[in-house]
Amino acid sequence: MGDSRETFGPKAFVTGFPIKHSRSPLIHGYWLKTLGLPGSYRAHEVAPEAFADFIASLKDGSSGFAGGNVTIPHKELAFRLADRPDALSQELGASNTLWLEDDLLHATNTDGRGFTANLDERHPGWDRHDTAVIFGAGGASRAIIQAVRDRGFKTIHVVNRTVGRARELADRFGPKVHAHPAGALAEVMKGAGLFINTTSLGMDGEAAPQLDFTPLTADAVVTDIVYVPLKTPLLAQAQEQGFPIVDGLGMLLHQAVPGFEKWFGKRPVVDAALRALIIADMEAH
């Protein structure tokens, strides 16, 4: 029998396709329990062809949800179907957090805030530099480019195997963003103070190319948005070469904070116990 607190209070969700491996219910469940709040948060799988109907049920109240998180492959459609997407969502063309307010469906994207909050927690002062290198130009890189630019970085080099994808991002995010092919990586790393891997290289223990991080500034920070494994091959290489590293788990944890506050009315804290809980779950699967 479930906790009686789940029967009352706001109900929130995470939806995607597939969604069964999401750790978001663990994160929000931890906060509901530690804060002693009524409410529930659960995974709710929705196929792409059913997503518009799901959003309609959210808007008219028949779903019973106060809002929720949206992940792959629904972020772009969530943005388009929301009544009030904010400026972050509008620039990205994607939303990952939805909530009902004044009978309207509002939307934002918290990925960038999760990324910067993770660096603020794990390596304060990371933003004193003005040049960043972003390795990869997939969907995940959009929010990170936006967040790094908005934190004051003057030059952002996006390096991608297919340079056309990187050019699309440069066109979207303005003159501070520069597109480069993979062969230019060593050159654009010179003098950069932040290196961000947004590719899947090294995910789930896959092999990753050997990278020389020494062209970076001596105090540059190297971070990876991949968090399985926690220390990716790229992070291990950077650490071996003497650079401070920040893993990607904190981005997952911190991006969840704004939504929880919207649905349940209290701002939660990313603490060591939550991080340990998620790491234990990762190790168990």
Curated annotation (Swiss-Prot):
Pathway: Metabolic intermediate biosynthesis; chorismate biosynthesis; chorismate from D-erythrose 4-phosphate and phosphoenolpyruvate: step 4/7. Keywords: Amino-acid biosynthesis, Aromatic amino acid biosynthesis, NADP, Oxidoreductase. One of its GO terms (cellular component) is cytosol. One of its GO terms (biological process) is amino acid biosynthetic process. Its EC number is 1.1.1.25. The keyword NADP applies. InterPro entries: Aminoacid_DH-like_N_sf, NAD(P)-bd_dom_sf, SDH_C, Shikimate_DH, Shikimate_DH-bd_N, Shikimate_DH_fam, Shikm_DH/Glu-tRNA_Rdtase. Shikimate binds at residues 22-24, 71, 96, 111, 227. It catalyses: shikimate + NADP(+) = 3-dehydroshikimate + NADPH + H(+). Gene3D superfamilies: Leucine Dehydrogenase, chain A, domain 1, NAD(P)-binding Rossmann-like Domain. One of its GO terms (molecular function) is shikimate 3-dehydrogenase (NADP+) activity. Pfam families: SDH_C, Shikimate_DH, Shikimate_dh_N. Disulfide bonds: none annotated. The active site is at 75 (proton acceptor). NADP(+) binds at residues 136-140, 160-165, 225, 248. Belongs to the shikimate dehydrogenase family. Homodimer. Involved in the biosynthesis of the chorismate, which leads to the biosynthesis of aromatic amino acids. Catalyzes the reversible NADPH linked reduction of 3-dehydroshikimate (DHSA) to yield shikimate (SA). This is Shikimate dehydrogenase (NADP(+)). It comes from Rhizobium etli (strain CIAT 652).
